[in-house]
Amino acid sequence: MRSWVIPLLLAGVALAFDAADRRVPFSVLATGLLDEPAHLATAALGLLALACFIDAPRRFYVAGLIASVAIDLDHIPLYLGLLGNQDQRPVTHSLTTVLVIALAAAVSRRHRAVLAGCVAGLLIHFARDIAEGPPGVRMLWPIRDTAWTASYWWFLAMIITFTAVRLIFMTTGIPRRRARLFQPPVPVTSSETRSIPV
């Protein structure tokens, strides 16, 4: 498959499932079957764009994809009536969750790539949730309880930006070097070493 097909396919899936999700009346099953594929495709596209700039191990990207949909498991207590306000997304949909995982990544060298991937996946997930309009996302909880919302155009701009970045940078080969993250340094081969005159 040509390398430009995948970004375009992911963009199409994200836009199609998002459009259907906005039109279908809410129900746990129907909404989940439309909302989660849209989140997954959006995250995959965003991570492809990010991969133009960083060289990270596969587990970083796998963790990002999983986190981009797994965060919605926090809705289960809401649907079971175990949380008070059912008109709001759970407070785990906030930068507090991102900060906790980012701090864990900073102190855990062994799991740093996985945790950093989770951070990336969560940020992309929250960005799309914001673009779904009300009830929005309480990003600054517990400092502020105000929900952030944006229009569909925010989501469309995300998809266009991710797709354009991936296609343009992949085609031009720029940047020529990506930042190497969460991996041991590449050993210098003998051909790369410079002889020192005696």
Describe the function of each predicted region.
Residues 1-198:
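N-terminal membrane-targeting hydrophobic helices
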